Curated annotation (Swiss-Prot):
Parts of the chain that traverse the membrane: none
Name of the protein in question: Altered inheritance of mitochondria protein 46, mitochondrial
Organism of provenance: Saccharomyces cerevisiae (strain JAY291)
Organelle targeting sequence: 1-20
Lineage, opening ranks: Eukaryota, Fungi, Dikarya, Ascomycota, Saccharomycotina
Entry's family note: Belongs to the AIM18/AIM46 family.
Keyword field: Mitochondrion, Transit peptide
Keyword rRNA processing: no
InterPro entries, A to Z: Chalcone_isomerase (IPR016087), Chalcone_isomerase_3-sand (IPR016088), Chalcone_isomerase_sf (IPR036298)
Subcellular location: Mitochondrion
Any single Gene Ontology cellular-component annotation: mitochondrion
Length: 310
């Protein structure tokens, strides 16, 4: 192990084609001499980013030869892929914070009969309080939610909120206000059919452009953001296997951290960060407020969760 550490240190010092690990990944050391120990006492090789793939040899939570079935800590999305964890975060998963699942469903492409991905939407556990702070605010309640005149005694604020979140005109306003609050979200995209990294990148870009608000945004900023998205995929090429995971973390400033988990290899790859906030905001607003969202089932469950948190 000492010899391996020396080799990793030497590799990590190469500057050509290498990038420093993002700050949000601080709970995993990028210095080979600081390999941490997992619960079983086995060493975890630290992460190398950039053109080198980042491999984490951590405790496996799945059977290599079988799809992980739902249990008390996970929920089924589709029989072709592993169940989605109800909670995801460090130390098992190298994310910036702990996340909780608030919506899941199947994402279809081109035809309702072609199931492409399982989609999960997660919220940062520390940020759940922002839902009520934003959606129960006096301004939004009076202007967009509790607008019946005279007020109906039969409908509660939660009833009115559910109606507003299903309204094509009001939903984008409410969701954009929630995103502006700094709430952290994460999407988990798990291929039901094998695909490619190019498809993942193109699909993310198309989802951004499907948001009608994208048409009124600064084109230069959008193009700069799409270039950052493209740069995140420079280090990975080829096929994406069924049941692998593509993660998009939405930060407080609406920048996005992109990462990929190769399940059979047990490799976690940090793809990079899209700093332009327009991309992250447009993408997650499309997930949560679109008339034709990537997964209507996931959006419905997210609405139910937001109502219950308000």
């Amino acid at each position: 192990m000492r010899l391996i550490s020396k080799v990793l240190v030497k590799t990590n010092c190469l500057e050509v084609g290498m990038r420093r690990a993002p700050q949000w990944y601080s709970h995993y050391s990028t210095t080979a001499g600081n390999a941490r120990v997992n619960k079983k006492g086995s060493k975890v090789v630290p992460v190398l980013t950039g053109l080198a793939l980042a491999s984490i040899f951590a405790k496996k939570w799945y059977d290599d030869s079988q799809i992980k079935k739902a249990d008390a800590t996970s929920v089924a999305v589709d029989a072709s892929i592993s169940a989605f964890p109800k909670k995801m975060g460090p130390p098992q998963w190298p994310f910036s914070t702990q996340y909780e699942l608030i919506g899941k469903g199947v994402r279809c492409v081109s035809s309702i009969t072609f199931k492409a991905y399982g989609l999960g939407i997660y919220v940062a556990a520390e940020d759940k309080h922002l839902v009520s702070e934003v959606l129960d605010s006096k301004f939004l309640s009076q202007a967009f939610i509790d607008t019946a005149a005279p007020p109906s005694p039969e409908n509660s604020h939660q009833d009115n909120l559910r109606t507003a979140l299903n309204d094509p005109a009001k939903a984008p306003i409410l969701i954009n206000n929630l995103l502006d609050s700094g709430i952290r979200l994460m999407s988990k995209n798990t291929p039901i059919k094998a695909g490619s990294f190019k498809l993942l990148m193109d699909g993310t870009k198309k989802s951004v452009l499907k948001n009608p608000d994208s048409q009124s945004q600064d084109k230069d900023r959008l193009e700069a953001g799409f270039q950052e998205l493209h740069d995140c995929f420079r280090s990975v090429k080829g096929l994406v296997a069924r049941d692998d995971d593509f993660f998009i973390e939405l930060n407080k400033d609406c920048s996005m951290n992109l990462s990929y988990y190769a399940r059979k290899k047990d490799e976690f790859v940090i793809l990079g960060t899209v700093k332009e906030p327009l991309i992250g905001k447009l993408l997650f607003a499309h997930y949560l407020a679109a008339v034709d969202p990537p997964s209507p089932e996931a959006r419905k469950e997210v609405i139910d969760a937001l109502v219950s948190l308000s």
